[in-house]
Amino acid sequence: MAESPMTQARMEQIFSDQVDAIEGPSGAIRTIVDEVEIYLISDPTNDRMRILARVADVNRVDPRIVNVLLQANFYRTLDARYAVSEGIVFSAYLHPISTLSREELISGFDQVLALAKNFGTTYSSEKLDFGIPGAGAR
């Protein structure tokens, strides 16, 4: 049986099922997992969603780490990425709502959490590592 199309309500229910508690209005809910604040932001009108976790203030990040983040986005992440917005480094997963599956939503959540937790160490969204040429542990 085919999975029904994703909706904002269904997406938020699946998100809620993964955590102990959520707060915030529909379209902008948040939770805390392992001391990491994770947000599910959705815009059904434009068929877009994103899962975000605040990682660091960019002003407090060694400028050399920005290059490490870009390399990690290529070699050590799957579908989630490091991103910078308004002076903040985030881990982020973006997807159209209508084609999002339950498994992709859960995987995106897990990857965002892993990137946030692995910032400063492996910079990886999971155990996958294609290896950064010329990069040692940072």
Residue spans for each PLM region:
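Charge-rich, low-complexity N-terminal segments
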Residues: M1-E37, T77, R81, R138
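Short, well-structured hydrophobic secondary-structure segments
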Residues: L40-L52
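Short, surface-exposed beta-strand-loop junctions and turns on beta-sheet-rich folds
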Residues: N46-R48, D57-V58, I97-T99
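Short, internal acidic amphipathic alpha-helical interface segments
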Residues: R50-I88, A92
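Short, highly charged C-terminal tails/helix-capping segments
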Residues: S124-R138
